[in-house]
Amino acid sequence: MNFRHVRMLLLLFTMILWNVLLNAWILERTRQINCFSYETALYSFRKHRVSGELLARMQEEAEEKGMSEKELFAVYFAEDGSVTDPGQLAVEALYAKRYQPQAYARICGYLSAVWDDLERFPVGTVASDGNAGVSFADSWMQSRNFGGERGHEGCDIMASVNERGIYPIYSVSDGVVENVGWLRLGGYRIGIRSPSGAYFYYAHLAEYAKEFEVGETVLGGTHMGYMGDTG
């Protein structure tokens, strides 16, 4: 083999190596750019499809890795729930934290705002009827036409007993009253800002349990009023 052939082989090897390295760089760069979709995470977070079994697996993985389960769920929501393996989510969380830190931190913050302050379910039992229950479904941004065409910015909790003023409504968290009183679309409502920044909005009340004032501090479990259909 003469020198010319050796040089051609070296050139070919260099080109192949360069092509492999370039493809690896492109794949890695693409992964960095697409490792976390804030828009998808926000949409999926609002859907909040989380089972008790998945939560338990996430908590176990997070404890093992020295992370918070919220860090894993932020990526889970960014994948629109398509990835459920906690180990894989832990790896993707590292990418998101490194290459999309602001978007990732915002979703983690939303999770903290909701999860960290929750103390109870907002609807209590009916003293006069132990079988009276409630149900709810994902109604976020469903079409509404009262007051004009719009999307529904809430989740309605429906009573099995269609009677105003028998289901007690409680604050799900500690917080400060930010809004209270009559609203055309929401009827009698009260809005509570929790310590972590979440805004919990209780609308369509039949009546208040007492006279609340803006700026007033409430505790989780505070009786705020009764379920109704005002507004």
Model regions: which residues?
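Cationic-aromatic interfacial patches
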Residues: 2-98
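Extracytoplasmic/periplasmic, Sec-exported soluble proteins
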Residues: 50, 64-65, 99, 149, ...
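Surface-exposed, glycine-biased beta-strand/turn segments
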Residues: 89-188, 220
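A residue-level detector for short acidic-glycine micro-motifs
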Residues: 138, 159, 179, 204-207, ...
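Structural recognition of the beta-strand scaffold that forms the well-ordered cores
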Residues: 156, 168-171, 191-193, 200-204, ...
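Short histidine-centered loop motifs in beta-beta connectors
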Residues: 162, 170, 180, 196-221
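Conserved, short, structured surface segments that act as functional micro-motifs
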Residues: 191-193, 214-231
